[in-house]
Amino acid sequence: MDQNLKEQILELKRQKNAIILAHYYQRPEVQEIADFIGDSYNLSKIAKENDADTIVFCGVKFMAESAKVLSPQKKVLLPQPKAGCPMADMADAEGLAALKAKHPNAKVVSYINSSVEVKALCDTCCTSSNAAKIVKRIDSDEIIFLPDKNLGSYVQEMVPEKNIILWDGFCKVHNMIIPTDIEEMKNKYGDMKILAHPECWKPVRDMADFIGSTGAMIDYAEKDTTSDKYLVVTETGIMYKMQERVPNKTFYPLRSMVCVNMKATHLEDVYNSLVNSTFEINIEENLRQKALTSLENMLILGR
């Protein structure tokens, strides 16, 4: 069944000059049929630079929105319309406008995990792979950072010379992990290196041997010569690409770290989206132009 469906998807993709982008947190079978698998930053670049007519974005809504902002001439499809991001929903344009009024000299840096309405009010976006670099490069000593307070506190540690005003948002999957979860895994499986995403809260980050984005974690594990066992403290979907890229090492996920929104997309959704061109992302042009500035600044500052 799955193999037949995959073949039909690949044929539809060819017929429609479409590409399938999948985030590392997607289901393994979805990653298998993707043209490109990556983190938010790399997928944003691909969406902008690729010459396909249609982008099928297997991720969550803010990712598909970002692709449409960067590539308005392309048809952008989100196969599963219920795939939202609770953290992105924690930041609203009205609240951000009020915070900007309280801090008129601050520059606003939004994690790409935000709505297009929030991006329209920001000076630049960032991802977990380039947040510290962008905050360091932006021409202001005062920064409003949203929506993730954990990533923001990590950036504050990396860029102590800046005054960072944190929004009170978080990723539910990463924020729920506590130090005892790490200790239990080490007691069960023995000594191993800990790879943690910066969306984790500080007590967990402090236990990590390496802190980085999903892509950076895979790169680190591939190049590291000091260990062959790793505890991977991020969403479990990363295991598919991590084990493929580094088959000679052992990776232990935290089984509780499952994002139901990232796992909402199934092969059937991708097939139906290609057949019926559903569900297409449309953004009002004035709003798109405002959001475009923050995403383009991210691509420039994040180089």
Swiss-Prot record:
Pfam families membership: NadA
Binding site for iminosuccinate: H23, S40, Y111, I112, N113, S128, H197, P198, E199, T214
GO CC annotations, alphabetized: cytosol
Major location (coarse): cytoplasm
Positions that bind [4Fe-4S] cluster: C85, C171, C259
EC numbers, comma separated: 2.5.1.72
Family recorded in the similarity comment: Belongs to the quinolinate synthase family. Type 2 subfamily.
Protein name: Quinolinate synthase
Species, as recorded: Clostridium acetobutylicum (strain ATCC 824 / DSM 792 / JCM 1419 / IAM 19013 / LMG 5710 / NBRC 13948 / NRRL B-527 / VKM B-1787 / 2291 / W)
Source lineage: Bacteria, Bacillati, Bacillota, Clostridia, Eubacteriales
